[in-house]
Amino acid sequence: MKIPQRTRGYLAIVIAAVLFGVWPSLSKRVLTEVHPFVVALLIQLVPAIALSPSLRRLRIARSDWPLLALSGVVGAVAAPIVYFYGLERTTASNSVLLSNSEALFTILFAYAFLGERATPREYLALGGIAVGAFLVTTQLRFGDVQFLGFLIGNLMLVGAAVCWGTSNTASAVLLRRIPIFPLLEVQLIFGTVSFAVLVPLSGAPLAVPSDILPDLLLLAASAVGMFSVLFFYAFRTIGAMRTGAILPTSALWGILAAFYFFPNETLSVVQVVGGALMVGSLVVFYLFRGPTETRAAGETLKPEASDGPDSP
């Protein structure tokens, strides 16, 4: 039995949300031993090498280069710098919470610039996902979140989310004309080349401790490479707004990843309720999904999200 394309899109973003949830805890572990610039270089270099064959016979229209450069510089250079330095200046719980703001900006930008809309019932389910993510990440223990004590780091994480939301919007437009693998490869090249210059200029040591190397490779392969492919595939099949709406479920997986890396922690009742609300809302969001709306003829910002190709 063939799985419908839109269903594959929802499955792709659900899996991507799991990988996205692992990102903060895994990054926090790696940053304890490796300089942020070196982390940003290596986690983009590894998938860039793996995807390099996709550049064969690639042709990019001259009119697409400004948008492609914007997505590469903002998403693969500026965002990692701000994110990793912000991550060093805040707590793990704050990073899980604030990582979800990328989904918020992706939804807002899809609404404002891509002309995407959802049905009233989808908006209701979206609200349920947001509330569930809020419960999972905060546990309603606001004294532990320490926003004021880590204000600079928190603001940097939000700034990184704005950068990635901007890059996501540009990518959603470019995916209408450029296949997933080549687009991702060009963006990774932007990041790899930029950090290859920044690392020696900063004087950061390239040496990676052997006990951290597996975490770094896992971060590169899963949280960057696999996540980006699945994320872009969801863009093409269900649209940027619905992709961004489901991404906050990463908070649940982020908490579970934190328990794996820090086994002394336990789930609270509030987190169990929040996780159930997120999963239930996700099911409702899928069951009551509506068709992706398109703009009037002549308006080209909205990608043909529901009619993308079957393969990257």
Where are these regions (language model features)?
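Hydrophobic/aromatic residues within transmembrane alpha-helices
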Residues: 30, 39, 86, 112-114, ...
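Hydrophobic transmembrane alpha-helices of multi-pass small-molecule transport proteins
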Residues: 46, 51, 69, 109, ...
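Transmembrane alpha-helices of multi-pass small-molecule transport proteins
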Residues: 32-78, 105, 163-167, 184-203, ...
